[in-house]
């Protein structure tokens, strides 16, 4: 019986049987001597798929016609295997994605119906934007019956930054009396905490699949809060090799979550933290192309169009160029400045002594002696990006951005600042929260204002 064709890999041998166990070439008497020559000369399967018959014949000292016949049969078997793997399977409506409500009608409309199964939904944003609030709200709303907008399912809540805040969940339940009548309780939420990356990996790859298998379809939502907490701390990225290994790790993790979402018809919703994307300070101009990641980044992370154009022009013309006019003015900041300058008995420099609360976006200030420059001093551009990069983004079906910024308070907008008797200008600002669908398989990009209440996340 002829020997199996071997692949040389990292100083070991892996035979053709491992690659194509059903291959008829393994035991074809016609190629027995060729297989012996292949083994003796250390020629691998990849060589047969990439080299010409002439080059192969020289390597193994066999006739070019014999090599050509073997090569053609091997390629044919690989093509058949590829077509078998890529065969399309029709999906019946019963097995397609379903959605459940967020417990807010306006949010559901923004998301194209709600949170969908068979995929990964990412919620990202800075701290105190309400990511965990929304996740806990989903852990309750998924328990609603299908006529009420839910899936009648249970939830698995995986935390990486501490224990699940059960008191906040209880507060949400008590503020929604109808939930108690519908049988929605914390007992339908399985919770587990992981304190390091190894523990997180074990939960996703071992414990979670076992729990889902035993639940027999009763679990409809898996929440991870947050997905990047341990990854960004423990994954080293000091070399190109480590960078590639990290990408492979993220791919495997995301694919595992997608497989679970598909096999068990459930939703995977994760929170993601953010990092900074500084503005390039290179004085040398360089052209960016549509295919460049930096060119596409703004649309993948929810930046404003003015920020995207500003960064592109900064790269094209260099950091020394003045592109401030591209950015939008902070109208609320300028409004408060004008109001403060007219308030009697408030004779202090607003910009030097009184700063507004921390603003979400970085600003650009223009140095000019023109009277108009004082009105155009504050310019905003986006610089926050979700962690884990493009590798992770490619696996996300819906990306939701939660933003927290500040706007002029009602007393300023109504022109009633003169009625305010205090001395703290921070009272002239109020929180502005925005939910933005960056991209989604099920909905168009859009945004809506929201607020955090006792009931959870509600549209303003």
Swiss-Prot record:
SUPFAM superfamilies the UniProt entry points to: P-loop containing nucleoside triphosphate hydrolases (SSF52540)
Main location: nucleus
Keyword Hydrolase: no
UniProt superkingdom: Eukaryota
GO terms classed as biological process: DNA recombinase assembly; DNA strand invasion; double-strand break repair; error-free postreplication DNA repair; heteroduplex formation; meiotic DNA recombinase assembly; mitotic recombination; positive regulation of single-strand break repair via homologous recombination
Signal peptide: none
Location within or outside the cell: Nucleus
GO molecular-function terms, A-Z: ATP binding; ATP hydrolysis activity; ATP-dependent activity, acting on DNA; ATP-dependent DNA damage sensor activity; DNA strand exchange activity; double-stranded DNA binding; single-stranded DNA binding
Listed InterPro entries: AAA+_ATPase, DNA_recomb/repair_Rad51_C, P-loop_NTPase, RecA_ATP-bd, XRCC3-like_C
GO cellular component assignments: Rad51C-XRCC3 complex
UniProt cross-references to PROSITE patterns, sorted A to Z: RECA_2
UniProt keyword list: ATP-binding, DNA damage, DNA repair, Meiosis, Nucleotide-binding, Nucleus
Positions annotated to bind ATP: 125-132
Function: Participates in the repair of X-ray-induced damage to DNA and in meiosis. It may act in part by stabilizing a repair complex of other RAD genes.
Additional remarks: Present with 238 molecules/cell in log phase SD medium.
Entry similarity comment: Belongs to the RecA family.
Protein's name according to its UniProt entry: DNA repair protein RAD57
Provenance organism: Saccharomyces cerevisiae (strain ATCC 204508 / S288c)
């Amino acid at each position: 019986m002829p020997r199996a064709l071997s692949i040389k890999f990292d100083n070991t041998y892996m035979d053709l049987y491992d690659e194509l166990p059903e291959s008829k070439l393994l035991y074809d008497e016609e190629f027995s001597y060729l297989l012996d020559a292949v083994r003796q000369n250390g020629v691998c399967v990849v060589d047969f798929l990439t080299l010409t018959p002439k080059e192969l014949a020289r390597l193994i000292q066999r006739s070019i016609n014999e090599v050509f016949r073997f090569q053609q049969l091997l390629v044919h078997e690989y093509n058949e295997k590829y077509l078998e793997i890529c065969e399309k399977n029709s999906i019946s409506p019963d097995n397609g994605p379903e959605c459940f409500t967020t417990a807010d009608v306006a949010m559901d409309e923004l998301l194209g119906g709600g949170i969908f199964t068979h995929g990964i939904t990412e919620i990202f944003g800075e701290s105190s934007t309400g990511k965990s609030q929304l996740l806990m709200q989903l852990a309750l709303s998924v328990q609603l019956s299908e006529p009420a907008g839910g899936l009648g399912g249970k939830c698995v809540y995986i935390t990486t930054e501490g224990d699940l805040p059960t008191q906040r969940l209880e507060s949400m339940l008590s503020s929604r009396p109808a939930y108690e009548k519908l049988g929605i309780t914390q007992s339908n939420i399985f919770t587990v905490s992981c304190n390091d990356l190894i523990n997180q990996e074990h939960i996703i790859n071992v414990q979670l699949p076992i729990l889902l298998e035993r639940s027999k379809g009763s679990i409809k939502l898996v929440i991870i809060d947050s997905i990047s907490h341990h990854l960004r701390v423990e994954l080293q990225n000091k070399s190109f090799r480590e960078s590639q290994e990290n990408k492979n790790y993220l791919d495997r993790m995301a694919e595992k979550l997608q497989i679970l979402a598909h096999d068990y018809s459930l939703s995977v919703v994760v929170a993601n933290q953010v990092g900074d994307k500084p503005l390039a300070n290179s004085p040398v101009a360089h052209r960016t192309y549509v295919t460049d990641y930096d060119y596409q980044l703004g649309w993948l992370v929810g930046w404003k169009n003015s920020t995207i154009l500003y960064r592109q022009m900064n790269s094209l013309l260099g950091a020394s160029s003045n592109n401030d006019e591209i950015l939008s003015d902070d109208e609320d900041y300028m409004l408060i400045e004008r109001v403060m300058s007219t308030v009697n008995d408030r004779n202090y420099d607003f910009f030097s002594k009184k700063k507004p609360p921390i603003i979400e976006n970085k600003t650009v200030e223009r140095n000019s002696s023109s009277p108009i420059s004082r009105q155009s001093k504050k310019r905003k551009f986006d610089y926050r990006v979700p962690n884990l990069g493009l590798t992770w983004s490619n696996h996300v079906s819906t990306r939701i951005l939660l933003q927290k910024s500040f706007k002029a308070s009602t007393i300023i907008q109504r022109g009633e600042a003169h009625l305010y008797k205090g001395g703290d200008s921070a009272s002239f600002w109020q929180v502005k929260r925005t939910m933005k669908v960056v991209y989604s398989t099920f909905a168009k990009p859009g945004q809506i204002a929201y607020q955090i209440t006792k009931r959870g996340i509600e549209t303003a």
